[in-house]
Curated annotation (Swiss-Prot):
Top-level division of the source organism's lineage: Eukaryota
Segments forming a coiled coil: none
Main location: secreted
Organism listed in the record: Aedes aegypti (Yellowfever mosquito)
BP GO annotations: neuropeptide signaling pathway; regulation of multicellular organism growth; regulation of response to food
Protein name: Short neuropeptide F
Length: 215
C-alpha cells in the first residue's frame, strides 16, 4: 500500500508540476495577444484582420474623410457631378467671363458671345507672296480696294514684275513726279537763263559765228 501510494503521489506530483510549467506560458501568450489586440483596437477604429502575424493597415489612417488634394472618401459624395453642373462650370470657367481672383461679372450675359464671335479677326484677304484673291471683293468697291494693300511691284535688285503692272494704276503719274523732283532747279542758277526762249536765243547766237566762218 505504501508503495502504491508513493507511486501515485509521484505521478500526481509530476503531472501537477507539468501543468504548473505549462500554464504560465499559455497565460503569458494569451495576455500578450490580448494586450496587442487591445492596442490595435485603440489605434484603429475598425477591427483589424491579420494572418500569420502580419498586420493589414487601413488605407485612411486619420479619422477625417479628407484625403490628399482635397478628395473625399465619403461614398455619399458623388465622384462625378451631373451634366447640368458640368455645363455651369464650363460657362463660368470661360476666359472671357472670369475676372481677377475668380470673380465673375454679373453684367456679362450670354448674348455677348455673338458679339465676341463677330469681333474676332476675319480671315485675311491677302494670300501668300503678296497675292490677293479676286473673288473676295467686288471690283466696284473702291474703298475696299484702297483698304487692301497693293501687291509688291518691286522684285529683287530693283527689278519690277511686268505681270503686276495692271495693279499699279498710277505708275506713270508717279514716274513723272519722280522725274520732276530729280531735275535740278534752274531758278537757283543765276548764270543760266531761266526760260526756254532765252535758251534758244543763246543757242542761235552761239551758232551764228560758226556759220559765218564756214562761209
Amino acid at each position: 500500500m505504501c508503495r502504491i501510494n508513493f507511486t501515485t503521489l509521484s505521478l500526481i506530483l509530476v503531472l501537477w508540476s507539468g501543468s504548473l510549467m505549462s500554464e504560465p506560458s499559455q497565460n503569458a501568450d494569451g495576455s500578450i495577444k490580448g494586450l496587442y489586440e487591445y492596442l490595435l483596437q485603440r489605434e484603429y477604429a475598425a477591427p483589424v484582420s491579420y494572418a500569420d502575424h502580419q498586420i493589414k493597415r487601413k488605407a485612411v489612417r486619420s479619422p477625417s474623410l479628407r484625403l490628399r488634394f482635397g478628395r473625399r472618401s465619403d461614398p455619399s459624395v458623388p465622384v462625378e457631378p451631373e451634366d447640368d453642373d458640368m455645363v455651369d462650370q464650363r460657362s463660368i470657367r470661360a476666359p472671357q467671363l472670369r475676372l481677377r481672383f475668380g470673380r465673375t461679372d454679373p453684367l456679362w450675359s450670354s448674348f455677348n458671345e455673338n458679339a465676341l464671335l463677330e469681333e474676332k479677326r476675319a480671315p485675311s484677304q491677302r494670300l501668300r507672296w503678296g497675292r490677293s484673291g479676286g473673288g473676295m471683293f467686288s471690283t466696284n468697291d473702291v474703298m475696299q480696294q484702297k483698304a487692301i494693300r497693293a501687291p509688291q511691284l518691286r522684285l529683287r535688285f530693283g527689278r519690277s514684275d511686268p505681270s503686276w503692272a495692271m495693279f499699279n494704276e498710277h505708275q506713270l503719274d508717279e514716274q513723272q513726279f519722280a522725274d520732276a523732283t530729280r531735275q535740278p532747279s534752274k531758278t537757283l542758277r543765276g548764270d543760266e537763263p531761266t526760260s526756254i526762249e532765252s535758251t534758244e536765243q543763246v543757242e542761235s547766237e552761239e551758232n551764228s559765228p560758226s556759220n559765218m566762218d564756214e562761209k
